[in-house]
Amino acid sequence: MGKQVNVGNVVFGSDSLPLIAGPCVIESLDHSLKMAESIKTITEKIGMPFIFKSSFDKANRTSMDSFRGPNMDKGLAILSAVKSEVGIPVLTDVHLPDQCLSVSQVADVLQIPAFLCRQTDLLIAAGKTGTPVNIKKGQFLSPEKMKHAAEKIATTANQNILLTERGTSFGYGLISDMTSISIMQ
């Protein structure tokens, strides 16, 4: 896409490299606050913009026995607290179209998980919120195919679209091909 996307005071563009980081899944308010504060301290020291990322539901876990997260209501309350107490933008995954509007009331960025990056209804629902959307490239897609995911969101008049290189599957391994970034721009 090769353009600038603003998320609060964080700018994504050709001259900046913001960090999206945090625990994969929300464990507790205390843990989330501690992680956000620690990462913020480090990124401020090196002058790197930072968005806190954590998920209220990891719906794509391999095992049914794995911890999925606190649920949407509790997770959004925790993300809201992180956002206000630490003073940073927050990002979280959405898995279903009917989650997008509620999540956009708290999250500064809606993230589409890699395995859901071609789900038209989800992409359109996320785009319709007007909130910036980060689409993780599916391991099964070439970077050229990501333009179709971005175009689905763009049909909603939301131009605040970010694409994240997630890697490519080679057998059972996952390899990140950094040349994909320039193609997806």
Where is each model-derived feature located?
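Short, well-ordered coil/turn segments that N-cap beta-strands
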Residues: 14-17, 46-50, 84-90, 106-108, ...
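Generic structural signal for well-ordered alpha-helices
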Residues: 33-40, 76-80, 100, 123, ...
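Alpha-helix-loop-beta-strand connector modules within alpha/beta enzyme cores
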Residues: 38-46, 65-91, 126-132, 182-185
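N-terminal amphipathic alpha-helix/helix-capping segment at the start of soluble metabolic enzymes
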Residues: 1-19, 77
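Catalytic alpha/beta core domains of metabolic enzymes, predominantly
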Residues: 130, 134-185
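Glycine-rich, proline-tolerant flexible connector loops at the mouths of alpha/beta enzymes
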Residues: 23-32, 50-72
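Catalytic beta/alpha-barrel core
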Residues: 70-71, 85-99, 108-121, 132-143, ...
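Conserved, mostly hydrophobic/aromatic
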Residues: 22, 52, 103, 135, ...
